[in-house]
Amino acid sequence: MIPQAAEYLLKWETKAFAYLALTLKDGTPQVTPIWFDWDGTHLIINTARRRVKDKALHRRAPVALAIPDPHDAYRYMQIRGVVEDETEEGGYDMICRLNEKYHGQRDYPKRPGEVRVTYKVRPTQVFSNIR
């Protein structure tokens, strides 16, 4: 489903950010830049419990992500999808992994009482202007 010419945006070494668009409970849109990973089938998103992202993803609201090329923001891929999985298990390890991807070190600050949660988003539609 991912266009071959745009696959590089999902690779670890590209370090592309995604812009996650969600619909809040009251129907208003919200967009957040995020770190992400790709397991070949799902986009992996990590957040802390009770944050805006967590509340919207937990409701299984449809999502959209724009992933621009880090070197040319006019080249991008848009992914629309659905949340298929949510777990707190391994949540802190996942944010450490993402910290390593984007900052080169696994050591992510652990905040007292913070619970990390990982979501898997399955793409349902993919659009790209990369040829």
Where is each model-derived feature located?
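A short beta-turn/loop motif at secondary-structure boundaries
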Residues: 26-28, 69-73, 111-113
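A generic structural signal for nonpolar/aromatic side chains embedded in well-ordered alpha-helices
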Residues: 9-12, 56-57, 98, 121
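Extreme N-terminal tail/first-helix region
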Residues: 1-18
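Short beta-strand segments
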Residues: 15-49, 57, 63-67, 78
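Hydrophobic alpha-helical segments typical of transmembrane helices
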Residues: 4-8, 53, 94
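Short, surface-exposed beta-strand-loop junctions and turns on beta-sheet-rich folds
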Residues: 51-53, 72
